Amino acid sequence: LKVYLIKSKNTESGTIETLPEFEQLQLIDDSNIELKSIFENNKKIAIISESSIDIILATLQESNPKRKAIELFKDKFIFRKLIKDENFKIHKIDFQDIYQLKIKNKSVLKPLKGCFGTAVKIIDEYTDLQKLQKEIRKELEKNSTVFNENVLTLNEFIVEDFIEGQEYAIDMFYNSDGKPCIVNIYHHPIPKYEQYLHMIYYSSKNTFNEIYPLAKSFFEQLNEKINVTDFPMHCEFKLIGNKLIPIEINPMRFGGMGLGNLTYYSFNINPYQYFLENREPNWSEIFQNVDDDLRFVYFIAYNAFSKDKNTNYPNIQKLKNEFTNIKLEQLFDYQKQLAFGVFCLQENEENLHRLLQIDFDDYFEPIL
């Protein structure tokens, strides 16, 4: 038995480089001619890049519940109807029309398909939309060199209601019986500088205690509607009161950016092994001896926002001096990527708060 990991040439940095050593894990390129037979003959398949979506849909038969679920989650309009969230308003808009938007309430403007927080903007009636449109154009030009149109749409945008509340992410799968198995829960605090939106995700005892029962209940109810088995997903929620409101459910980026591998470097739990073995980690046992103040952090070291990466380079040691306990360090070619590395850390609450104030411009220095 194996877990097949479907990757593409546009797979995000960090996803593969941080994978746990696991003999029963096999990486398959989405252009592999065997792809159709792999899907027909194997149950344990995880897709790790949104840019594979067209190939995956073409490979799966129309009647396949997995295909139906992927299409459903891809279309944010149908998805909202499915979860009966009529209060949540969402509509499409072309990039060129952004400056004409009439905004009454706080809203989120973002590309229809997006990645890495690119061009995600919180707007309200006071936003200077012409100025914002120019900023977005600049950001899209910069990031579209790394992502293709399958992953980052340049012209199609959506405007949706802004949901107040803390943000959480969950990596999970439905096992062979369709039961939800949660392999990690993260709090996603918003950093001081929103251009580094995905800088920090962390797990903690309190996060699990608060979110786990709500998530379990949500996923059980969801599968009464989508009826999938052996189906891994990455999900994002806002917590309002004691209700989880889904922001995104994405079966195309399980473990994307390497976030799903944090659980391995924190608790020695290999999410792919649990997927293969159809089981969930015993979280109450895992957290039994964990200090309440301990934060297991996935840290994305972004490139500087306003310094040219052709004339500046990251001072990695300066950044590392900010950390308490590094469990994993994985560096990238910052000239080709939007970040220069990812780190798995163990921090306390106080230092975590300090890390959220980071401006990566301060960690880039002139190439002499």
Regions found by a protein language model. Name each.
Residues 172, 223-258, 287-309:
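Conserved metal-phosphate-binding beta-hairpin within the catalytic cores
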Residues 90, 126-164, 200, 221, ...:
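Conserved ATP-binding module of the ATP-grasp superfamily
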Residues 276-368:
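Peripheral (often C-terminal) accessory segments that flank ATP-dependent C-N-forming ligase machineries
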Residues 113-114, 162-166, 227-231, 334-335:
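A short catalytic or substrate-binding loop motif that flags glycine-/basic-rich loops and adjacent residues
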